[in-house]
Amino acid sequence: MVKTVDFNGRPFHFIGIGGIGMSGLAYILAKRHLPVSGSDVRSSHITQRLQSVGAKVFNTQEATNLTIFQPTPEDSLTTLIPCASGESKKVEKTHQADSALSPNSLPQIICSTAIADNNSEYQAAKELGYPIFHRSDVLAALIKDYYSIGVAGTHGKTTTSSLIGYMLLGGGLDPTIIVGGEVDAWDGNARLGQGQFLVAEVDESDGSLTKHSPRIGIITNIELDHPDHYQTLDEVVKTFQIFEQQCETLIACIDCKTVRTHFKPQITYSLDPDREADYTVKNVTYKTDGSMAEVWEKGQYLGQMHISLLGQHNISNALAAVAVGRTLGLDFEVIASGIATFIGAKRRFEHKGYSQGITFIDDYAHHPSEVRCTLEAARLRLDQDRYRRVVAIFQPHRYSRTATFMDEFATSFDDADVVIVTDIYSAGEVNIGQISGQQVADAISRHHQQVFYHPSLKSLGSFLSQILEPGDLALFLGAGNLNQIIPELISPKVA
């Protein structure tokens, strides 16, 4: 019987192995020399990276992918096991095969919330009696395997966890790192270290945050998001409160009112010196190469911190890393040196190129608060480098999120000179409420003079070539596939 994730040689098979959350786990397991296989309908540089470390990757999601394991009838389970929804279901013995595979060699099937119950590969795994785990079960087991630092929050998780990982690398601690974005420093979204520390981004989107119990937990902020799972902010708070109870030490940003009201962190940080946080900053300045600030610890001056990122939100993310470093006993000079050399994660205000006098930036922002903060950072960049305009190209992400935050999106683009809205990236959702990008554009236009709606990505490049001018900063916003058109704008096709 397999009730918990097993790291003692039992194979892992990931359905949807190319996803950003799944691939990081698969990479770590493969680098630990465990048998790893998986499937994804799209081949990508992510799946190619997994193949380079020994993972077997199928480019379809079919029942036949599982024939590589060839179980016997005795290998089937009749017990309660976690399924993709995080619940348990009884799996009956249904498969007959001729093989010598022992119960101890049954593959562990790993799914994410994105895998539907009618997925043929998932259905086959159930019928075969294979133990099925949610990806969060694997991460939770890894967290217990290390001295773990879990970074949670509605916004800033990837940058904060990457900063912490980079800081520990700079301090010679050789951490294992799993984040929700790609970082050039470790050529992807995960790295296997030989040290005792694991830095992990822990996700609240589907409620699985409650499975994690790191030694040090961080909460960057809390807002209502993921309306496909949460109906109210209170529901989000309850999820984070369970996480708080499971952390040995909680570090949290008390600039967030929800955190101040509902949580009791042992260590606090804030951008406001008047909040009397354990860690704060003073005399923040912004330059073309990033941000500078004085860092203070419990009223004592620690030193100057420089980060190559713009925006108050990134100062806050860096301050979280400082708090973690000091909690682990690192000298501030080591912390500051590590933070100073971090250049950011991919799709987090990522500089994609420069063409015909136009700078192209890609950012993952898809929540109103993220859009607002990213545009504030763009405005800072414009003021420092004397760009002419900030042109925001926005692809709304998910019908449920767009409908829930329509009014908030309407007022999130104040720092843009021009706004272009595309159609909504569904992320697999059904458009029950008949929400459209046109509605988003109309809402923004009630507060903004220059708003355009251009639904199709196929012709968006041509449209932008007419809108963009030398001196513009073109900022692509969204968690979907909007950034795929950037290369054609940087390297226009010759007619």
Swiss-Prot record:
<dbReference type="InterPro" id="IPR013221">
    <property type="entry name" value="Mur_ligase_cen"/>
</dbReference>
<keyword id="KW-0961">Cell wall biogenesis/degradation</keyword>
<dbReference type="InterPro" id="IPR000713">
    <property type="entry name" value="Mur_ligase_N"/>
</dbReference>
<feature type="binding site">
    <location>
        <begin position="153"/>
        <end position="159"/>
    </location>
    <ligand>
        <name>ATP</name>
    </ligand>
</feature>
<keyword id="KW-0067">ATP-binding</keyword>
<keyword id="KW-0436">Ligase</keyword>
<dbReference type="GO" id="GO:0005737">
    <property type="term" value="C:cytoplasm"/>
</dbReference>
<keyword id="KW-0963">Cytoplasm</keyword>
<protein>
    <recommendedName>
        <fullName>UDP-N-acetylmuramate--L-alanine ligase</fullName>
        <ecNumber>6.3.2.8</ecNumber>
    </recommendedName>
</protein>
<dbReference type="InterPro" id="IPR036565">
    <property type="entry name" value="Mur-like_cat_sf"/>
</dbReference>
<dbReference type="GO" id="GO:0009252">
    <property type="term" value="P:peptidoglycan biosynthetic process"/>
</dbReference>
<keyword id="KW-0133">Cell shape</keyword>
<dbReference type="GO" id="GO:0008360">
    <property type="term" value="P:regulation of cell shape"/>
</dbReference>
<dbReference type="InterPro" id="IPR005758">
    <property type="entry name" value="UDP-N-AcMur_Ala_ligase_MurC"/>
</dbReference>
<dbReference type="GO" id="GO:0071555">
    <property type="term" value="P:cell wall organization"/>
</dbReference>
<dbReference type="InterPro" id="IPR004101">
    <property type="entry name" value="Mur_ligase_C"/>
</dbReference>
<keyword id="KW-0131">Cell cycle</keyword>
<dbReference type="GO" id="GO:0005524">
    <property type="term" value="F:ATP binding"/>
</dbReference>
<dbReference type="InterPro" id="IPR050061">
    <property type="entry name" value="MurCDEF_pg_biosynth"/>
</dbReference>
<comment type="function">
    <text>Cell wall formation.</text>
</comment>
<comment type="similarity">
    <text>Belongs to the MurCDEF family.</text>
</comment>
<keyword id="KW-0547">Nucleotide-binding</keyword>
<dbReference type="Pfam" id="PF08245">
    <property type="entry name" value="Mur_ligase_M"/>
</dbReference>
<dbReference type="GO" id="GO:0008763">
    <property type="term" value="F:UDP-N-acetylmuramate-L-alanine ligase activity"/>
</dbReference>
<comment type="pathway">
    <text>Cell wall biogenesis; peptidoglycan biosynthesis.</text>
</comment>
<dbReference type="InterPro" id="IPR036615">
    <property type="entry name" value="Mur_ligase_C_dom_sf"/>
</dbReference>
<dbReference type="GO" id="GO:0051301">
    <property type="term" value="P:cell division"/>
</dbReference>
<dbReference type="Pfam" id="PF01225">
    <property type="entry name" value="Mur_ligase"/>
</dbReference>
<dbReference type="Pfam" id="PF02875">
    <property type="entry name" value="Mur_ligase_C"/>
</dbReference>
<keyword id="KW-0132">Cell division</keyword>
<keyword id="KW-0573">Peptidoglycan synthesis</keyword>
